[in-house]
Amino acid sequence: MVSVNPRPKGFPVFDSSNMSLPSSDGFGSIPATGRTSTVSFSEDPTTKIRKPYTIKKSRENWTDQEHDKFLEALHLFDRDWKKIEAFVGSKTVVQIRSHAQKYFLKVQKSGANEHLPPPRPKRKASHPYPIKAPKNVAYTSLPSSSTLPLLEPGYLYSSDSKSLMGNQAVCASTSSSWNHESTNLPKPVIEVEEPGVSATAPLPNNRCRQEDTERVRAVTKPNNEESCEKPHRVMPNFAEVYSFIGSVFDPNTSGHLQRLKQMDPINMETVLLLMQNLSVNLTSPEFAEQRRLISSYSAKALK
């Protein structure tokens, strides 16, 4: 059991201050108060002690001649450090760039009108972030897609402003949506001053609509037939193209030139291009065996 009394009876008490240690020679004693030992446990013995930093190589100074060459090279080559290194001759690229950085900071702080080469453009990202469309953009109102006729596959309508207005005015089935959406347009401001009318006064809606319809009529009169009845084809009709090329080798078929003139321009260009490639391939030495085979067929047909 543990005794509650801090000093049990009969237990000797030792006082360290009165104790003496034997001297090194065995004749005297050294008092304990004369020797103090302090141990600091705050430092971690496992931490690695950093070695003192010593400068092994002295910093190379730039002479006035080297600095003048550096300034001249800046005017000639801007930030092409390799060419500046070759021009200076006695400094490396690392030393030149370090010197240039210090020189640029010094010029910017002093505000002197010295020549500083423009910074190099940053590399463009291979996958740039998508640019969001600005919120405050005035979109021109066009007729709804339900009022326009469906386009045939393989055709493309011209996208310039005049033909677009012509297609809208002639090909639209009804004009109700056009009149409805034209009211949402911003009111234009008068550019030419008229007597009795303010220069910044907006025009009435009826007048704007009347002028727009007159412009549409004036634009759509000459190209009504071209815009709606005869659109331009984007892709050639390969069925017609290969049918014509096959008929060229048919001895019972004639009138190839007339048929070629009646084709669409893109079909005609495709036929001519394929026939030209065919003639080049047949004249090349790689197809000598095929030519010999074709000539044997023609000889059999003549017999």
UniProtKB/Swiss-Prot annotation:
Species this protein is from: Arabidopsis thaliana (Mouse-ear cress)
Entries under Pfam families matching the protein: Myb_DNA-binding, RVE6
GO molecular function, one term: DNA binding
DNA-binding region as annotated in the record: 81-104
InterPro entries associated with the record: Homeodomain-like_sf, Myb_dom, Myb_dom_plants, SANT/Myb, SANT_dom
Residue span of region Disordered: 109-130
KW Oxidoreductase (keyword) present: no
Subcellular location: Nucleus
Stated role: Probable transcription factor.
Any one GO CC term of the record: nucleus
Membrane-crossing residue ranges in chain numbering: none
Key word GTP-binding present: no
Keyword annotations from UniProtKB, A to Z: DNA-binding, Homeobox, Nucleus, Transcription, Transcription regulation
Listed name of the protein: Protein REVEILLE 5
Domain of life of the source: Eukaryota
Positions of the HTH myb-type domain: 54-108
Record PANTHER family: PROTEIN REVEILLE 5, SWI/SNF COMPLEX-RELATED
